[in-house]
Amino acid sequence: FRSRCFEQIARLVKKIWQERLGGNKMIGIGSDHGGYALKQAVIKHLEEKGYAVKDYGCYSEESCDYPVYAKAVANAVKDGEVKQGILICGTGIGISITANKIKGIRAALCSDTFSAHATREHNDANILAMGARVVGEGLALDIVDTFLETEFSNDERHIRRINMIED
């Protein structure tokens, strides 16, 4: 009981601290074994930039099933536990397909910064998916920065199109 109370207090303090810093900068991240090493590099990069990161697994390079981690991150985004999500597997394909099964999730598989910028600006994507076997670490970090730093345009045409997806 006591440890649960401390955990709840810690979560509340963290939430208040984030709100005082200008909003929820909590990023949820998950990967399968194929994306584990890149995920570790992304976490380090994000923390150095001041983001709070919640790691939903996996926690080693031991073979595992990507849908478990895709669903965990997607549900955290959907429920507002984290602001945005990042998912990494070998190609980014399976993990993005899985995330997009969750209502309200717009996961975009990006292998370049142009796509990362466009999907945030036009589609208001809330999860970035990448393939660790497709992009190297340097490009991946550039993609992550572009995705997180690009705001949704709020143009009427983009809102209309997103609403058509949600219906």
Where are these regions (language model features)?
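N-terminal beta1-alpha1 ligand-phosphate binding loop
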Residues: 27-42
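Short beta-strand segments
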Residues: 30, 87-92, 110-111, 129-131
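C-terminal binding/interaction regions
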Residues: 34, 113-167
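A short beta-strand-loop structural module common to alpha/beta enzyme folds
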Residues: 52-63
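Helix-adjacent hinge/juxtasegments
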Residues: 69-108
